[in-house]
Amino acid sequence: RYSTTGSSRKRNAQPIRSKGPNGEIALAHNGNVVNAAPLREELEGWGCRFDTSSDSEIIAHMLTNVPGADWGERVATMMRRLSGAYSLTVLTKDAVMGIRDPLGVRPLCIGKLDAGWVIASETCALDHIGATFFREVAPGEAVIIDSKGLRTIYKREQNGCASCIFENIYFARPDSAIDDKLIY
């Protein structure tokens, strides 16, 4: 996937990898972080080295460097600090996480396969691999899929939803469903 910000160069392509005190992750991001510049400066002050000009790398470094006893606490800290729109898929050494911004600007869904779970930004991706739609990741929710199964690890309450008006018109494929509504 091409970067959400920064130039469309190979080094900005996703997934973005980051390694820090919390382990190593690979992250895919749909959206834009509007407070990226001050967060980047702060992370550089912590000793984080940036290889891209992408806001996705800022999110990845936050997750691998913010304090917290577990992924739920780290995601909570990250979500309190980020401003903007984001749907994230994060791969750790033993789990996959799906994280959606508090306003639900970008879609994110969970699918079920016979052998496990899938996280995707659109339901049409589920169709291509034979997965069935399970549910949307709610605005402000972070889910994790690990050896314990699928569960919510953080839920930030927010009044209302602010889905992007261009999602259904320009971005989404016509064979997708977003927020439980068919696009076509």
Regions found by a protein language model. Name each.
Residues R1-P139, I144-Y184:
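Conserved short alpha-helical segments that host acidic/polar catalytic motifs at enzyme active sites
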